[in-house]
């Protein structure tokens, strides 16, 4: 598991979602630099797990110019490593103890899975409705961007108005991404 996880995590990427968590926490006054790093790692673990699963679903052999985990070790191992990364994320969140963040990131993980299923249901549709397309990217992409920014606000103990503003910013950024 360690070798496969390391291969995937070292295969590149911008770590944008984790950065959004860190910067949102900083923007809203967080200074401790421990919880934000741990919870930004959770956001990145969720994203990495979804990429591992997505590569299996899409039968991808390359991601960012590097062989995918599933192309090296097989689909079954890749799915299990994705599940492992999600489990590690939940362990970190439970240790953190913030139920609002646990609820936010667990529901976001569910939304991402729903978005993937919705995309599969409409695969190959040339006449895909714009509304359906927006629903898919809202669930698959924007949900995690939104959760990343809101998590940063939660870490710093922001008020509801600040949380909603950062959540909205993340969602809009994710839709544009």
Predicted regions and their residues:
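Mg2+-dependent prenyl diphosphate-binding active-site environment of isoprenoid biosynthetic enzymes
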Residues: 2-177
